[in-house]
Amino acid sequence: MSNSSFNRQWAKVILETLTRHGLRHICIAPGSRSTPLTLAAAANHKLICHTHFDERGLGHLALGLAKATQQPVAVIVTSGTAVANLYPALIEAGLTGERVIFLTADRPPELINCGANQAIRQQGIFASHPSETLSLPRPTADISARWLVSTLDNAMNNLVHGALHVNCPFAEPLYGDDIEHDTPWTQALGKWWQSDKPWLQETLSPSVTTHPQWDRLRQKKGVVIAGRISAKEGIAVAKWASKLGWPLLGDVLSQTGQPLPCADLWLNNPQVKAELNQAEIVIQFGSSLTGKRLLQWQANCSPQMYWVIDAIPGRLDPGHHQGEKFTLSPSQWLTAHPAIDNLPWALSLSHIATQTYQHVTEVTDYFGEAQVAHQLDHLLPHNGQLFVGNSLIVRLIDAFAQLPQGYPVMSNRGASGIDGLLSTSAGVHRATQKPTLTILGDLSALYDLNSLALHQQVYAPNVVIIVNNNGGQIFSMLPTPMAERERFYCMPHALNFKHAAAMFGLDYVAPNCWDDLFTTVTACWQGEAKTTLIELIVNETEGAETLNQLVKQVTAYDFSL
């Protein structure tokens, strides 16, 4: 059998093995060394193949697909710096838990460290960031197909969250003979080919037990913090906290409906602090909290008990509280820890949150990014989803908006980078094929500009709002030196996105008032399946200044009057 044909068989077994663990979407970049993997993916009828010319965007596309499906997604790239371009998406997957399998083609060992073209040291390139790593040998019939299948099965069984990096060296020739489908090497797997089960199956039965003190603790004064959790979990946590009578501090990604909106504006108020300091237990669901004041309160609170519930292992508590971490999903934990009917104990918080929300409405009565953040719920598509960018816009939405309970909200808030946001939102849209609203800043859009190509292929109305405040205006909120702030931090660019939209064949609109924005977005949801890029050219500092102003006003306000 020729080398090219056996390379194809080896790759065929790899891809088929991964489908037994739920793999359906695979993202492929162009490259020669990855030919065996690419052709194996193309030939596997179980797989939906996505392509992109930029490996950094491709990795984030896979991340978005994994976020929305909650299933493993694979990436195929060629050798060399193509592999390094996957680093940001791999890091994000490790922090937010999406299972992404990075299949990186490589030169064989004899071509490493000898000056061969496009050959770099790929083994261990991602250091400690993957949850699992496999460095496969060069394909050879001396290694049984059973070893290859069981090795991959074992890695997938261990991949509870995060990334799996599989480095796959292939020797030339890479092209030539068609694959031989029935050989002694593949026949060793027998009836596995006709099944849909893994070769090596592992059954995990995590025991979820009720905490021995729960009957006593649920009668105490508690506070619930909700970070990044799923839409279903957000609904369940909100109902659970309400039944207990415990105040719920919900992050923008909590999908709880934020029953106490604008918390990041009022958490520093002395009356609020005095009331919340009575909490005897604080229970945090999920992580990646956005608001600065919420993070400060979380770090400074000192209840008798502090519990964190998240399926991702690790502390997930930057406040380093003494307490307990439950590494399981919030839904599993809630089942084992039912609520009882208690009267609310922090009675003033509902009044404070309502007054603050009304004040935000009054202050943001002119067109700008603060108003858009506050009124964002009016722009959401029915039965759709929201993808939120990073930097300033997510903080404004977290502080000013109240999003519907259970409405799907996704973002890259693990490492919170501005790279790969357009490509991640494209993956989210492709996975669900639902109407999708993406909102992000101008620098984020410039950083990932070529990923607008991924928004050409859509399955439902797709709106991308770019809030253009001419640079990184989040830095105007920080005590950066005035003399250097503009040049070295904000970096104004004086660009707009009209020609970028035209380059990628996307519709473009630049409304200059709220009514025009609302009318445009509403028409998009009622129209055909296409992408509309909406650019909001806003005052450079209005959003940051409004946030700072409101924090100061609400912190100093006497809500007892």
UniProtKB/Swiss-Prot annotation:
GO biological process, any: menaquinone biosynthetic process
Q: E.C. number, please? A: 2.2.1.9
A GO molecular function held by the record = 2-succinyl-5-enolpyruvyl-6-hydroxy-3-cyclohexene-1-carboxylic-acid synthase activity
Q: In which pathway does it act?
A: Quinol/quinone metabolism; 1,4-dihydroxy-2-naphthoate biosynthesis; 1,4-dihydroxy-2-naphthoate from chorismate: step 2/7; Quinol/quinone metabolism; menaquinone biosynthesis
Keyword list (alphabetical) reads: Magnesium, Manganese, Menaquinone biosynthesis, Metal-binding, Thiamine pyrophosphate, Transferase
NCBIfam families, per database record: menD
Tell me, how does this one assemble? Homodimer.
Role of this protein? Catalyzes the thiamine diphosphate-dependent decarboxylation of 2-oxoglutarate and the subsequent addition of the resulting succinic semialdehyde-thiamine pyrophosphate anion to isochorismate to yield 2-succinyl-5-enolpyruvyl-6-hydroxy-3-cyclohexene-1-carboxylate (SEPHCHC).
What's the protein here called?
A: 2-succinyl-5-enolpyruvyl-6-hydroxy-3-cyclohexene-1-carboxylate synthase
* Annotated source species: Proteus mirabilis (strain HI4320)
Q: Which gene encodes it?
A: menD
